[in-house]
């Protein structure tokens, strides 16, 4: 079926001597793998439009099974700052990898196309990339099959008491029921607050995110435990982010920016 589609380029892979496989998350049809003949040849006409960290509108032959094909590019947005900054690159790669793992190929992803678009645009603007990644991680728990209860206590339904996260109970426990799980995460009220807020945050409406460093570090710890113990997903791009803190030095602020 030859049709217009909107897509986010998730990754590229060399194929044979002169060709390439490119996976897109499409707004209409979910994840699709495209065969790009001659993409590695010098002078390939769509080379600039099929760079990493691009999104746009395309015309292609989309197949229900097997590889699809791109005929032409109608418009494209290049996330330039992500491509130039190793930290932004790392967080963008991580959230795209999570999306790739969370959803099967060839199935529409609904609101997640816009949520990933917004996440990448915020990261490209250097708007709290680590926290944007946290939002994606928290909201992807449901597609991963974990779906913790973050609205109220899983035992009694109360939300007016201090809350903590329990992996055993699949979500929050209020203070009256903390004794039920001695291995609860012992999270601070601030970390639980942002865990709950981020679970419903629409990134399209976000212009800035500010969280104290101590709370951000605790949120990172909580999500690492949940992903390790409940989700079971450990990506190379996440390990790179974990290691990056020991050697990465941010670039100087870009000129003409606040």
UniProtKB/Swiss-Prot annotation:
It holds the Pfam family RecO_C. PANTHER family: DNA REPAIR PROTEIN RECO (PTHR33991:SF1). GO terms for biological process: DNA recombination; double-strand break repair. This is DNA repair protein RecO. GO terms for cellular component: bacterial nucleoid. The gene is recO. It comes from Lactiplantibacillus plantarum (strain ATCC BAA-793 / NCIMB 8826 / WCFS1) (Lactobacillus plantarum). Gene3D superfamilies: Nucleic acid-binding proteins, Recombination protein O, C-terminal domain, Recombination protein O, zinc-binding domain. Keywords: DNA damage, DNA recombination, DNA repair. HAMAP family: RecO (MF_00201).
């Amino acid at each position: 079926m030859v049709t217009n589609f909107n897509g986010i380029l998730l990754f590229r892979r060399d194929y044979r001597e002169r060709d390439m496989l490119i996976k897109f998350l499409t707004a209409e049809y979910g994840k699709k793998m495209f065969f790009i003949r001659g993409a590695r040849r010098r002078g390939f006409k769509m080379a600039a439009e099929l760079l990493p960290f691009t999104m746009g509108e395309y015309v292609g032959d989309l197949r229900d099974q097997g590889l699809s094909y791109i005929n032409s590019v109608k418009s494209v947005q290049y996330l330039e700052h992500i491509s130039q900054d190793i930290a932004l690159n790392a967080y963008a790669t991580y959230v795209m990898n999570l999306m790739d793992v969370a959803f099967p190929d060839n199935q529409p992803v609904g609101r997640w196309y816009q949520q990933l678009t917004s996440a990448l645009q915020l990261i490209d603007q250097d708007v709290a990339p680590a926290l944007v990644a946290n939002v994606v991680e928290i909201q992807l728990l449901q597609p991963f099959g974990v779906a913790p209860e973050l609205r109220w206590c899983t035992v009694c339904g109360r939300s007016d008491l201090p809350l903590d996260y329990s992996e055993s109970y699949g979500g929050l426990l209020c203070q009256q029921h903390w004794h039920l799980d001695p291995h609860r995460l012992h999270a601070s009220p601030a970390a639980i607050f942002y865990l709950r807020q981020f679970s419903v945050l629409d990134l399209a409406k976000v212009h800035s995110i500010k969280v104290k460093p101590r709370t951000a570090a605790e949120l990172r710890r909580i999500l690492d435990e949940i992903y390790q113990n409940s989700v079971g997903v450990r990506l190379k791009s996440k390990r790179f982010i974990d290691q990056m803190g020991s050697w990465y030095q941010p670039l100087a602020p870009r000129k003409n920016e606040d």
